[in-house]
Amino acid sequence: MAHFAKLGSNSKVIQVLTLNNGDMLNADGKEDESVGQQYLERHNNWPAQMWIQTSYNTGGGKHKLGGTPLRGNYAGIGYTWDEDNNIFYGKKPHASWVLNTTTASWHSPIGDAPELTDEEKSADSHYEWNEDGKSWDLTNSLA
């Protein structure tokens, strides 16, 4: 099965549909995204260029099964299609975070949260992003 994201006029994903691979074969018998787009246009009354193929096995710029990643992430409803970078990405989690177009994921302006020590792990601690302080704050889930 192939998956296609239906885009709204603002490049937001408004639906994701599956398509039988046989419905996107070109004259040479090879899967072709444009054939799938044309099929979806005919059967869903939505312009072909507003259907973008997405891979269920792609996330964070990597293919879960070791294959070639397709477009950064599997497109979900509400995701944004970035045509310039050929990626789908989710909602920005915090105002200060920046998009890494290689991994199609958001990152804090100071990098990833620090690694937890064994003691912190045993205390069920974790780091939460503090947008006001632009910092990772250590918190305890049991508190």
Predicted feature locations:
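Interaction-interface detector
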Residues: 1-143
